[in-house]
């Protein structure tokens, strides 16, 4: 570890790998709410928040587990399709509260083309919430709908490996080849619930 009078100990949340204070400062100074996307191995959280001296105030939030509980989502809760639907849900809730513009906050996630965080931001833009994002970083419509999973499942079915790879989908009563139509069905349920 470094020694000497010029050594500066990083703040606790920076040491823990949770907060980039420089980016957070730049977003707070903008004066706009933040569209926060966080992911774990199993779930995705999307929040719209404003910063206050006493702490952040959450205006609207959505969790990918809500897709299963409220809208009948049968696929995984941490894939590109789930990220899009969770972002759509959070954006519609934020629009109900009067938020029209937000700055993207992807935290310490690397900004890789086609990443889940950009699927959630694309959903917000599609819902009508303005969140700036370069068009080339968002995943394609085919990938968001899960068509790559459906085509992969068809190959596995021919080889007899479908039950091994997609056991969770099959246990939930969803054929992996039907994921694009199931995605559209759940998306329409969300839009109908918020009258859009």
UniProtKB/Swiss-Prot annotation:
Keywords annotated in UniProt: Ribonucleoprotein, Ribosomal protein, RNA-binding, rRNA-binding
A matching Pfam family: Ribosomal_L5e
GO cellular component, one term: cytosolic large ribosomal subunit
A single MF term (Gene Ontology): 5S rRNA binding
Family (UniProt): Belongs to the universal ribosomal protein uL18 family.
Subunit text: Part of the 50S ribosomal subunit. Contacts the 5S and 23S rRNAs.
Protein name per Swiss-Prot or TrEMBL: Large ribosomal subunit protein uL18
Native organism: Desulfurococcus amylolyticus (strain DSM 18924 / JCM 16383 / VKM B-2413 / 1221n)
Organism phylogeny: Archaea, Thermoproteota, Thermoprotei, Desulfurococcales, Desulfurococcaceae
């Amino acid at each position: 570890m470094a020694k000497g009078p010029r050594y500066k100990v990083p703040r606790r949340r920076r040491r823990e790998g949770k907060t980039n204070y420089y980016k957070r400062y730049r977003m707070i100074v903008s004066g706009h709410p933040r569209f926060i996307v966080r992911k774990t191995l199993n779930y995705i959280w999307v929040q719209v928040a404003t910063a206050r001296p006493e702490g952040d105030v959450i205006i609207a939030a959505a969790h990918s587990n809500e897709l299963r509980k409220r809208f009948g989502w049968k696929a995984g809760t941490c894939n590109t399709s789930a990220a899009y639907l969770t972002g759509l849900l959070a954006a519609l809730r934020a629009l109900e509260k009067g938020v029209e513009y937000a700055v993207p906050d992807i935290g310490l996630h690397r900004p890789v083309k086609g990443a889940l965080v950009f699927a959630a931001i694309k959903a917000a833009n599609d819902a009508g919430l303005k969140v700036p994002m370069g068009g080339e970083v968002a995943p394609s419509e085919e990938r968001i709908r899960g068509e790559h999973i459906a085509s992969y499942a068809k190959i596995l079915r021919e080889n007899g490996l479908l039950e091994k790879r997609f056991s969770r989908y099959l246990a939930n009563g969803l054929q992996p080849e039907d994921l694009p139509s199931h995605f559209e069905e759940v998306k329409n349920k969300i839009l109908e619930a918020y009258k859009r």
